[in-house]
Amino acid sequence: MFEMYIESGMNKLRCGYTTGSCATGAAKAATMLLFDLINSEEELNEIEIDTPKGIKVEMPIDNVVVGKNFVQCTILKFSGDDKDITMGLEIQARVEKIRKEEAEGLSKKLISNESKTIVLDGGIGVGRVTKDGLFVAKGEPAINPVPRQMIIKEIESILPKDKYVKVVISVPQGTEIGKKTFNPRLGIEGGISILGTSGIVYPMSEDALKASIKLEIKQKSLKSKNLILTFGNLGENYCKYLGYKEEEIVICSNFIGFALECCVSCNVKSIIIVGHIGKMSKIAYGCFNTHSRVCGVRLEVLALELTLLGYDISLVNKVLNEKTCEGAVKLLGSGYENLYENIGQKILNSMKTYVYDELKIDAVMYYGASNPILLWSSCLE
């Protein structure tokens, strides 16, 4: 069993392996059994693969099905201490013997290796790409380039000479799980993606989330050079309420600075950021990662702006004693349009400075979760 750990602060966190590694291991194991490269399935309890990271990964085989001309192996996705939505999913690879003529025919419409001895497809629970701008061509299964290479490399290393196989990767629960991922936003329908660039899942990593944000900006910028950035699902719902189209909206989580950089690199012309005052106030004073562990400034922004506007210190202290920006806004009530105008203008200036004025930027700031209420906007009537 694969055991690898990283240090995170005072904690020791266990790494896992990607869906790409699972698919590779299952395909390799099925190929070994199909061509009798191991005596019996009872002897194949575990499979070892090489990862692009240069680290060998051993994975337990959860289930084996042997048919007349095929073998199917299942490996359970293990995410380590990064308890993502794919943890425990069955990743299956069905490897079937086919004739040379069949392989050559299938290679014209499926993924294949150079010698056309291996053809690869996605089955149930593996998404299909329906839009341009992704790493995978429109119409193909959502098996990303690195996992494709991994699967083909491992099978090529053991496939007997003059033998041909069709490999189908499936995820029985993938259809439902896929709906809870970024896939529908990216135009990937019907399941999850088989992912991974290193083969290893590193717990608590921001890399995967940033990669999704970058990919969504890249894909949506192909259709529109005017995008809407927001922080999460509540912000997205408010964007739709305001009339913005889903194909223009990108959820950037806490990584607003990173998202702005991606917009510039993808030649986006303009963005509108729509966000709750708690997140937006951080941007006003130069915080471009809005996570509370990185930037705890919120109430201080309101307090400082109230002070600069000449409000009484007793009111400033009441604001500082609130637990949240939401509470502070409710405490203040109506009549503080000048406060939100000042914060809003500083948000715009801060963001324009961050991107060296390479984007046209507008902002919409609101409060309230279940029933958002507009506080200030640079672009709405």
Swiss-Prot record:
Pfam families associated with the record: CbiD (PF01888)
Cited Gene3D superfamilies: CbiD-like (3.30.2110.10)
Keyword Transferase in annotation: yes
Substrates-to-products reaction catalysed: Co-precorrin-5B + S-adenosyl-L-methionine = Co-precorrin-6A + S-adenosyl-L-homocysteine
EC numbers: 2.1.1.195
Any one GO MF annotation of this record: cobalt-precorrin-5B C1-methyltransferase activity
Signal peptide (from-to): none
GO BP: anaerobic cobalamin biosynthetic process; methylation
Pathway recorded for this protein: Cofactor biosynthesis; adenosylcobalamin biosynthesis; cob(II)yrinate a,c-diamide from sirohydrochlorin (anaerobic route): step 6/10
Top-level taxon of origin: Bacteria
SUPFAM superfamilies with a match to the protein in the record: CbiD-like
Membrane recorded as keyword: no
Keywords, ordered alphabetically: Cobalamin biosynthesis, Methyltransferase, S-adenosyl-L-methionine, Transferase
Cited NCBIfam families: cbiD
Family of the protein in this entry: Belongs to the CbiD family.
PANTHER family per the UniProt record, alphabetical: COBALT-PRECORRIN-5B C(1)-METHYLTRANSFERASE
Protein name per the record: Cobalt-precorrin-5B C(1)-methyltransferase
Protein species of origin: Clostridium botulinum (strain Alaska E43 / Type E3)
